[in-house]
Amino acid sequence: MEEIKKYLKLEISQQRNFIYPLIFQEYIYAFAYDRGFSRSILILSENLGYDNKSSLLLVKHLITRIYQHNYFIIAPDDSNPNPFWVCSKNFFYEIILEGFAFIVEIPFSLKLISCLEEKNKKIVKYQNLRSVHSIFPFLEDNFSHLNCLFDILIPHFVHTEILVQTFRYCITDVSFLHLLRFFLYKYCKWNSLMTPKKASYSFSKSNQRLLLLLFNIHVYEYESFFVFLHNHSSHLRSIHFEVLLERIHFYGKMECLINIFIKLKDFHANLWLVNESCIHYIRYQRKLIMASKGTSFFMNKWKFYFITFWQCYFSLWFYTRRIYINQSSNHSFEFFGYLSSLRMNPSVVRSQIIENSFLINNIIKKVDTLVSIIPLISSLAKAKFCNVLGHPTSKPIWADLSDYNIIDRFGCICRNLFHYHSGSSKKKFLYRIKYILRLSCARTLARKHKTTVRTFFKIFGSELLEEFLMPEEYVFFFTLSKASCSLQGVYISRIWYLDIISINNLTNYK
């Protein structure tokens, strides 16, 4: 118990006042629109030679640098404002809120950097681990040997006061906490965001950065407690545990864990070691997946531990009857826009001993990743690229743009989707998405020029084809076209990229 109290009691040096960046006032508007600021703080802090990566001098230098590239400055005290630049009250609140979200992210980015530095790891290596695709090779290597898994949806409704109290453990700045509470209650309709049926909230979906960050911090607190209790309750330590902290998604892996029985009344745990080789824990946003090669009885005990611990200490309530434990060979789960499952590949081996020969049937388990085509088409339908049945439609809102911008926008969306879903074992679903986007582009251009799609394809068909070709396809079609080899590998090969640090909005349909 004393060790737990020491863990919960933070050192004074770790408690910082995070309200000071707000004194820059007009600079809030500047850095609110810099999407790469969290990445630049890592790079510039090393290049400029600062020891304290959260120093006031560094923050001011970075904000000034961003501000110099901001040519459109809105002056609220202007006596003769231009009607074109007059913005609503909520618009300024959105800007301040996004800047406020950036300030909240600072301590957690520093926490990750310090964690990597303690282990003598270079930040350069960390850049590859930030990729969304980095988790899928891990699934391919480990999930094929596991038997049981369960995936649950974490309840999204959390009272705003609970989120504020989460910060009280690490921040002593009272004004910061009051300002955070003010934003959550006054301008962020958290209940509307957390309840799917209520779609009316003050800010746009792209400006939910602070709300999603606070929710992930709340869940991360639970996960850190979980690892701490495990490591201090047995002599069996985790072989590997890493936390890759991003804005909206976290990833963790724990091996050689222990079996835990819970007494529901006082929540004291009886712990002892079991002969369980490993458990894998993965979470992205609200999706939580646990997998093991143990029995369903073992997984049931883990399930009740998670639920009880979450309800008692974090006020998140689960419906236990809706959480099922499935056999990995008969269950598929959606994760990061992919539909993952275990595929059984039978193979026959002929063995011969002297004069006798016989056949041996082997079954090899392999993780198969497919594109979730139905939700992806639903996302395209919501974005007005097609109807609910997948029939392409024009995009009237883009009809006023130039031909180049229209083709470039459609081509960019298509390339991004192909790039992200390059790990799919079946590419034919992606070519259906390409067909929808290409025909939607043609209908948008035909609508603009007041002509038919057939006539437009006769004139610009080849240019549209080149715009929608992927870099991988260029390689196969132009490099391998001279060789007498089959192009079947184009449709079945899987490629995982290490430069994807965010999910396309069309893929992140949930």
Swiss-Prot record:
Q: Which domain of life is it from?
A: Eukaryota
Location in the cell reads: Plastid, Chloroplast
Q: Does the keyword field hold RNA-binding? A: yes
Q: Organism classification, top ranks?
A: Eukaryota, Viridiplantae, Streptophyta, Embryophyta, Tracheophyta
Please give an example of a GO cellular component term from this record. chloroplast
Family annotation (InterPro entries): Domain_X, Maturase_MatK, Maturase_MatK_N
Q: Which residues form a coiled coil?
A: none
From the Swiss-Prot or TrEMBL record, give the protein name. Answer: Maturase K
Which PANTHER family did the record assign? MATURASE K
Q: Which organism is it from?
A: Aphyllon fasciculatum
One Gene Ontology molecular-function label: RNA binding
